[in-house]
From Swiss-Prot:
The gene is clpE. Keywords: ATP-binding, Cell membrane, Chaperone, Membrane, Metal-binding, Nucleotide-binding, Repeat, Stress response, Zinc, Zinc-finger. Signal peptide: none annotated. It is a peripheral membrane protein. It comes from Streptococcus pneumoniae serotype 4 (strain ATCC BAA-334 / TIGR4). GO terms for molecular function: ATP binding; ATP hydrolysis activity; zinc ion binding. Residues 365-400 form the UVR domain. This is ATP-dependent Clp protease ATP-binding subunit ClpE. It comes from the Bacteria. The keyword Zinc-finger applies. Residues 67-110 are annotated as: Disordered. One of its GO terms (biological process) is cellular response to heat.
Amino acid sequence: MLCQNCKINDSTIHLYTNLNGKQKQIDLCQNCYKIIKTDPNNSLFKGMTDLNNRDFDPFGDFFNDLNNFRPSSNTPPIPPTQSGGGYGGNGGYGSQNRGSAQTPPPSQEKGLLEEFGINVTEIARRGDIDPVIGRDDEIIRVIEILNRRTKNNPVLIGEPGVGKTAVVEGLAQKIVDGDVPHKLQGKQVIRLDVVSLVQGTGIRGQFEERMQKLMEEIRKREDIILFIDEIHEIVGAGSASDGNMDAGNILKPALARGELQLVGATTLNEYRIIEKDAALERRMQPVKVDEPTVDETITILKGIQKKYEDYHHVQYTDAAIEAAATLSNRYIQDRFLPDKAIDLLDEAGSKMNLTLNFVDPKVIDQRLIEAENLKSQATREEDFEKAAYFRDQIAKYKEMQKKKITDQDTPSISEKTIEHIIEQKTNIPVGDLKEKEQSQLIHLAEDLKSHVIGQDDAVDKIAKAIRRNRVGLGTPNRPIGSFLFVGPTGVGKTELSKQLAIELFGSADSMIRFDMSEYMEKHSVAKLVGAPPGYVGYDEAGQLTEKVRHNPYSLILLDEVEKAHPDVMHMFLQVLDDGRLTDGQGRTVSFKDAIIIMTSNAGTGKTEASVGFGAAREGRTNSVLGELGNFFSPEFMNRFDGIIEFKALSKDNLLQIVELMLADVNKRLSSNNIRLDVTDKVKEKLVDLGYDPKMGARPLRRTIQDYIEDTITDYYLENPSEKDLKAVMTSKGNIQIKSAKKAEVKSSEKEK
């Protein structure tokens, strides 16, 4: 590409600038670049830019900045997105005579700190900072580090949303209030934007020059405490691909000697980036900011309550404040307090504010003053038509002033509003669960027994364990309940798990089911928690941990657990005892709101001889538990809340199960307006045909398909008009489907 100036030499220098809002590229050779740099007003260069306005010189300031970092006196500071690279009018600021703790007068040119930083102390002085509550220990620790002679650079580390930035705002507020040591009196906390600092430094050496100028400015102003949020960004910021001169390396000497006081904030994971640079890390003093407790969060919310009430023009009840803290901690697992509780408070206020039909009183007052001024101006100019218009506007605004919302009319946000927002965020029916919780726990055993037949002992044990946990007597952080269901196939182990999910969590979809026959190999543990670093699939989430992370209120069913590899069972030792598991990405997943149920057929083989309608079952539990020791280790079995044996089903149990299955058939037939009536003899016949001591109740479902559903299908296809059907026994002992009316006629004739 040829030079745009001489059109002879190849262009080796490419400059970018914004002209009238459009980006323009200038391609120059070395000779033309030197000429233009020396004389930006060169006529050839002005012709190349296609600008006719002689007074407008878009590139003069650019090259002036390259030469001495000082624009012409009549040129405003260039923003960082333009070709000046963000240096603007900062050159003269550091050399002005001023007091060490005073803000420069408005007539002075802005320095880099004012251009790329925000004065947090000034914001605190205006009262625009939310109250900082419950962080006194962290603020005192930061002040102690800042009071040191060298290496006085605290770095706040903690999970996202725990209040790291709030600690710095609290420090700024203490400086404004004068509640700091003498060394920190009059200091100014400046929050530096590293991204803007790097922006516009396209030419090699510009960023280093800007950093040196920033350092010089900070050295001259001894009242500066520099705050860098996301401080890990300084590692690698501004470095070229083949160089090692980044912001972190430039700051190292000043940080070690105490010439620069720096406060940083970053997360635990991102602080590892700084830890990789040992020389930089030793100059930092980490301050851990822990997640507040629920009680501390409630105190924080009450402290900022007034700010949000004034902003949204609503009122928060004490119940809503407590619900925001407790329910967010209980149902929102992938974020941290107090951030998630504050978000609930803010969103609830926003939701209620949208229902208000009024304008902010401050806006009305401002518009009224503007209308009165415009009316006066129109009257002076004898524009009476315009004056009449503004007179009507003034009357309108005064009428709106009378409709100001009063304290009595201010909408109140209750616990229900918070619950509704959580339902939208998590798809958990929080309101329904809370309303039903009391009565649900009382009648839990009865509700389960109505769906799970013949396992009253198992149901009673489960209900007691869950009630004990919900009342608050359970061990903290452990799952709501952990059970091992043992018994022969087809006796209701999986069915009880499904009904338990419906009763406790409102839907069978809340059950997370795993067939443990898929986890028979040693490496299959990675499928549950995610592959470790260096293995294929590392970026993919684990099947178990990811589902529980997004749906913490779930029932986890591990079917046929004895078939899984022993390492899988070892992994669940921590889950059953501590209620937590770390996935392949290093995230800790909580199981404290889940119910864990494992089913097994282990130990039932030697007791099958006792299965039957009239068999005695004394001593059977002991034999099953004794056999479990051959399949599971003692430390594994010791961690369950209960090992529950499911007994073989009796004939009466099977009759009740048949009735439930037939009720399900009727429910499916109702979509076609068909109703089926089944006699007691038919039910007994179905039990005789479908019972197998080794198979439990599962063969009954196939029997009903063969003798009821298939027969109904054939009869309905031949008689589509018949909607009222009845299953009866024939004289030969077969099951037959007939019209209910015809069956009644025949039975009445036999009676006669």
